[in-house]
Protein backbone atom coordinates (compact mmCIF):
# COMPACT_ATOMS: atom_id res chain seq x y z
CA UNK A 1 0.00 0.00 0.00
CA UNK A 2 1.53 3.36 -0.99
CA UNK A 3 2.53 5.57 1.91
CA UNK A 4 3.03 9.29 2.29
CA UNK A 5 6.49 10.82 2.28
CA UNK A 6 6.67 11.38 6.06
CA UNK A 7 6.10 7.68 6.75
CA UNK A 8 8.72 6.66 4.21
CA UNK A 9 11.20 9.14 5.70
CA UNK A 10 10.43 7.85 9.20
CA UNK A 11 10.93 4.24 8.07
CA UNK A 12 14.24 5.12 6.45
CA UNK A 13 15.35 7.06 9.52
CA UNK A 14 14.56 4.06 11.75
CA UNK A 15 16.64 1.80 9.51
CA UNK A 16 19.52 4.29 9.47
CA UNK A 17 19.53 4.88 13.24
CA UNK A 18 19.36 1.14 13.92
CA UNK A 19 22.21 0.50 11.49
CA UNK A 20 24.26 3.32 12.99
CA UNK A 21 23.68 1.94 16.48
CA UNK A 22 24.72 -1.55 15.42
CA UNK A 23 27.86 -0.28 13.70
CA UNK A 24 28.80 1.87 16.66
CA UNK A 25 28.36 -1.06 19.00
CA UNK A 26 30.22 -3.52 16.76
CA UNK A 27 33.12 -1.07 16.50
CA UNK A 28 33.66 -1.33 20.23
CA UNK A 29 33.98 -5.10 20.03
CA UNK A 30 36.11 -5.38 16.91
CA UNK A 31 38.25 -2.22 17.18
CA UNK A 32 38.24 -0.57 20.59
CA UNK A 33 38.61 -3.57 22.91
CA UNK A 34 41.28 -5.30 20.76
CA UNK A 35 43.29 -2.05 20.62
CA UNK A 36 43.17 -1.53 24.37
CA UNK A 37 44.05 -5.19 24.97
CA UNK A 38 47.10 -4.74 22.72
CA UNK A 39 48.27 -1.49 24.32
CA UNK A 40 47.41 -1.58 28.03
CA UNK A 41 49.99 -3.25 30.23
CA UNK A 42 48.24 -3.09 33.59
CA UNK A 43 44.92 -4.38 34.85
CA UNK A 44 44.07 -0.94 36.22
CA UNK A 45 44.45 0.61 32.74
CA UNK A 46 42.13 -1.98 31.22
CA UNK A 47 39.56 -1.52 33.97
CA UNK A 48 39.66 2.26 33.71
CA UNK A 49 39.18 2.07 29.96
CA UNK A 50 36.26 -0.35 30.30
CA UNK A 51 34.44 1.68 32.94
CA UNK A 52 34.83 4.88 30.91
CA UNK A 53 33.68 3.10 27.74
CA UNK A 54 30.71 1.65 29.60
CA UNK A 55 29.80 5.03 31.09
CA UNK A 56 29.73 6.75 27.71
CA UNK A 57 28.01 3.82 26.00
CA UNK A 58 25.21 3.37 28.50
CA UNK A 59 24.38 7.08 28.23
CA UNK A 60 24.17 7.10 24.45
CA UNK A 61 23.28 3.68 23.06
CA UNK A 62 20.02 2.94 24.91
CA UNK A 63 18.63 6.30 23.82
CA UNK A 64 19.49 5.47 20.20
CA UNK A 65 17.74 2.12 20.60
CA UNK A 66 14.64 3.76 22.10
CA UNK A 67 14.62 6.43 19.38
CA UNK A 68 14.82 3.73 16.72
CA UNK A 69 11.94 1.86 18.36
CA UNK A 70 9.83 5.01 18.57
CA UNK A 71 10.42 5.61 14.86
CA UNK A 72 9.32 2.06 14.09
CA UNK A 73 6.31 2.56 16.37
CA UNK A 74 5.28 5.74 14.56
CA UNK A 75 5.66 3.93 11.24
CA UNK A 76 3.56 1.01 12.49
CA UNK A 77 0.84 3.36 13.69
CA UNK A 78 0.83 5.35 10.46
CA UNK A 79 0.74 2.18 8.38
CA UNK A 80 -2.25 0.88 10.32
CA UNK A 81 -4.21 4.12 9.84
CA UNK A 82 -3.88 3.68 6.08
CA UNK A 83 -5.13 0.09 6.24
CA UNK A 84 -1.77 -1.68 6.22
CA UNK A 85 -0.24 -3.96 8.80
CA UNK A 86 2.03 -2.35 11.35
CA UNK A 87 3.25 -5.74 12.58
CA UNK A 88 6.50 -5.83 10.55
CA UNK A 89 7.53 -2.49 12.03
CA UNK A 90 6.66 -3.65 15.55
CA UNK A 91 8.77 -6.77 15.01
CA UNK A 92 11.69 -4.58 13.87
CA UNK A 93 11.26 -2.43 17.00
CA UNK A 94 11.11 -5.41 19.36
CA UNK A 95 14.13 -7.00 17.68
CA UNK A 96 16.09 -3.77 18.12
CA UNK A 97 15.21 -3.23 21.77
CA UNK A 98 15.91 -6.89 22.60
CA UNK A 99 19.49 -5.78 23.21
CA UNK A 100 18.32 -4.46 26.60
CA UNK A 101 17.12 -7.74 28.14
CA UNK A 102 20.14 -9.45 26.55
CA UNK A 103 22.31 -7.03 28.51
CA UNK A 104 20.47 -7.67 31.77
CA UNK A 105 20.30 -11.45 31.43
CA UNK A 106 23.49 -12.39 29.59
CA UNK A 107 26.04 -9.59 29.98
CA UNK A 108 25.39 -8.47 33.57
CA UNK A 109 27.64 -11.10 35.21
CA UNK A 110 30.62 -10.06 33.07
CA UNK A 111 29.89 -6.35 33.56
CA UNK A 112 29.54 -6.79 37.31
CA UNK A 113 32.79 -8.76 37.58
CA UNK A 114 34.65 -5.98 35.76
CA UNK A 115 33.06 -3.31 37.97
CA UNK A 116 34.03 -5.23 41.12
CA UNK A 117 37.61 -5.42 39.89
CA UNK A 118 37.58 -1.70 39.06
CA UNK A 119 36.54 -0.97 42.66
CA UNK A 120 39.76 -2.65 43.84
CA UNK A 121 42.21 -2.48 40.92
CA UNK A 122 45.25 -3.33 43.05
CA UNK A 123 43.82 -6.80 43.63
CA UNK A 124 42.86 -7.34 39.97
CA UNK A 125 44.73 -9.99 38.02
CA UNK A 126 45.77 -8.85 34.52
CA UNK A 127 45.02 -12.24 32.97
CA UNK A 128 41.54 -12.38 34.49
CA UNK A 129 40.75 -8.80 33.42
CA UNK A 130 41.89 -9.58 29.88
CA UNK A 131 39.76 -12.75 29.81
CA UNK A 132 36.69 -10.83 31.00
CA UNK A 133 37.22 -8.07 28.43
CA UNK A 134 37.51 -10.63 25.62
CA UNK A 135 34.29 -12.23 26.89
CA UNK A 136 32.61 -8.81 27.10
CA UNK A 137 33.68 -7.98 23.51
CA UNK A 138 32.22 -11.27 22.27
CA UNK A 139 28.93 -10.75 24.08
CA UNK A 140 28.78 -7.13 22.96
CA UNK A 141 29.29 -8.21 19.34
CA UNK A 142 26.30 -10.52 19.69
CA UNK A 143 24.30 -7.71 21.32
CA UNK A 144 25.11 -5.42 18.39
CA UNK A 145 23.31 -7.83 16.07
CA UNK A 146 19.90 -7.00 17.58
CA UNK A 147 19.66 -3.48 16.12
CA UNK A 148 21.23 -4.77 12.88
CA UNK A 149 18.51 -7.41 12.55
CA UNK A 150 15.90 -4.75 13.33
CA UNK A 151 17.34 -2.65 10.51
CA UNK A 152 17.31 -5.58 8.11
CA UNK A 153 13.66 -6.23 8.96
CA UNK A 154 12.83 -2.54 8.59
CA UNK A 155 14.60 -2.30 5.24
CA UNK A 156 12.88 -5.44 4.05
CA UNK A 157 9.53 -3.83 4.82
CA UNK A 158 10.49 -0.63 2.99
CA UNK A 159 11.42 -2.64 -0.09
CA UNK A 160 8.13 -4.56 0.06
CA UNK A 161 6.07 -1.39 0.17
From Swiss-Prot:
Primary location: membrane
Pathway(s) served: Secondary metabolite biosynthesis
Induction info: Expression is positively regulated by the transcription factors brlA and laeA.
Localization terms from the record: Membrane
Pfam families: Anthrone_oxy
Family per similarity comment: Belongs to the anthrone oxygenase family.
Name recorded for this polypeptide: Anthrone oxygenase tpcL
Annotated source species: Aspergillus fumigatus (strain ATCC MYA-4609 / CBS 101355 / FGSC A1100 / Af293) (Neosartorya fumigata)
Gene name as annotated: tpcL
Amino acid sequence: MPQNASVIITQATAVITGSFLSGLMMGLSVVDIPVVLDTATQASQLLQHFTRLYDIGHKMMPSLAVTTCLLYGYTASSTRTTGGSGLPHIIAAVTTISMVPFTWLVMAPTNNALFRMHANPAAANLGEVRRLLVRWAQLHAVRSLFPLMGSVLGLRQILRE
